[in-house]
Amino acid sequence: MKNNIKELLNTAVQANDLFMKRYKESATTIGLMDQALRNLGNNSEAVTIDSASLNKKLVFIILDSQPDIVGVGIGINGGEDLSLLGQYELNQLTTAKVVNLLEENLL
């Protein structure tokens, strides 16, 4: 696991903890896709935050070719198709920003 995905994972975990404290009815889980994406031929790693009750997931993707950029998308649990929500510099994707994305998309 590369340092940038570790940093992203840490930010996502902190944001998810805050989100679940604020919205006790929400049950979200964190996932890491590192080898799974590479096994599919994608030169990338991703962190997911899944909501089973809404059947939705936020996906934060870092491409090997752009290690300081995080693509953020939303999709359905178990699906591969994503709608792009935006791109962020890794160092600007704060815990507060991830909480905001969770509030906008998983409530």
Named regions from a protein language model:
Residues 1-54, 79-88, 92:
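Negatively charged, low-complexity tracts enriched in Asp/Glu with abundant Ser/Thr
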Residues 30, 67-70, 95-98:
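Non-transmembrane, interaction-prone segments in cytosolic or luminal domains
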Residues 43-49, 56-74:
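Short, conserved beta-strand/beta-arch hydrophobic-aromatic motifs that form part
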Residues 57, 68, 78-82, 98:
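Residues in flexible loops and secondary-structure boundaries
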Residues 89-107:
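Well-ordered alpha/beta subsegment
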